[in-house]
């Protein structure tokens, strides 16, 4: 099955036994993770197809999937966050200088993350310069933009937020 290129039908084309049929779609509830799933790609496809969907739009999805640009926006609006340095693939031409810049801004241990990889792909924790170099090489395998971020020691609190007509208070879960 695939989304019909005819935007007036707002449907899926289902192929079976040498023929096809159209299945109307009222709304799509994307339950996807990572690249192409939550980075604005599939949301853009839905918008081009004029099929309504649940969740964030293209821009919000794309920006929130990109750790570097999310940090830049959060910094711009003045929200406290872990210190960070953006390292680009092009910085690898002068990697020693790039690592000097990271070490000048952020004390060890340093978390090194591909900017747009999902989950924990390519994420490393560097305790020293040798580990920082290895972490940068691992991260660049997954994305050309890399986020180097200070370690924050403290409690991590998770809290699910569900929309409803009446609200029930749920406890936050500490990890």
Where are the model-predicted features located?
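Conserved small/polar residues in nucleotide/adenosyl-binding loops
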Residues: 168-175
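Proline-rich intrinsically disordered, low-complexity coils
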Residues: 4-5, 52, 107-109, 169
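Active-site nucleotide/adenylate-binding loops and adjacent lid/helix of ATP-dependent enzymes
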Residues: 18-23, 61-155
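Short acidic-glycine loop/turn motifs at beta-strand connectors
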Residues: 163-166
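Aromatic/hydrophobic pocket-lining residues that form π-stacking "cages" and hydrophobic walls in ligand
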Residues: 42, 135, 168
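ATP-binding N-terminal substructure of ATP-dependent carboxylate-amine bond-forming enzymes
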Residues: 1-59, 63-69, 76, 87-100
